[in-house]
Amino acid sequence: MPQFKHAVVITGSIGSGKSAVCELLRDRGFEIIDADKISHCVLDRCAAQVAEILGAQYVVQKDAQVANLNPHAEFSTSSGEEISSMPCVSVDRKKLGELVFKNPAELAKLEALLHPKITAEILSQAQALEAKEKLYFVDIPLFFESKRYEFFDKVAVVYAPKDTLIARVMKRNGLSYDAAKHRVELQIDIEQKRAMADFVIYNSGDLQNLRDETGSFLEKKLNML
């Protein structure tokens, strides 16, 4: 018996429409664990450690009382307590992303810090929802890539062809074809993900089509319970 028998992971590729599917599921009253939101919260809670490991330039202070401080000033990192004691600090995700995107060694350091905490929080929320004995969903964008969530054994892939993914990323992010193609190809190919899925939600049409596809998926899943 699976540990989380009422859970279904929602995943896909960049540009496939995972967020839209999750919104449609919320509209139908289903509870959803959002791995991205958890990751953002964990990242900010770990601001002190991020500064110690990668540099204080990746931490920003947002307290209104110090809003006029020199934005280029670096925080002291002689101890984590000094940064974590600030009224409101967070990680500059854009700057941090630029660092780890180009530097696998720094990315590995960040992942070693964050991933155990993220996984623990996802597990905690899943255990709470499992106790309700109702169907719920776990939105994990990089489910297949991460290989850290084998305790969830039912997976729905939101699918669109690769050319559609690239076009959407170009439009959404204002990228060139080559840049968008590169981002799409950083992830496991969408055709491989479709082959590994228990359920496929097709998203190549308009929003009404996606509503219909999501409804069909729910009907199949609910009939299996």
Which residues does each PLM region occupy?
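Hydrophobic anchor at the beta1->P-loop junction of P-loop NTPases
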Residues: I10
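P-loop (Walker A) phosphate-binding loop of NTP-binding proteins
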Residues: S13
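ATP-binding Walker
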Residues: S16
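Walker A/P-loop
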Residues: S19
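N-terminal phosphate/diphosphate-binding loop that engages ATP/GTP or pyrophosphate donors
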Residues: E23-A105
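Phosphate-binding/switch loop-helix module in NTP-utilizing enzymes
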Residues: L99, N103-E133
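ATP-dependent NMP and nucleoside kinases share a basic, alpha-helical "lid"
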Residues: E121-A131, L135-K171
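Small-molecule kinase domains that catalyze NTP-dependent phosphoryl transfer to phosphate-bearing small molecules
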Residues: E121-I122, L129, E150-F151, K171, ...
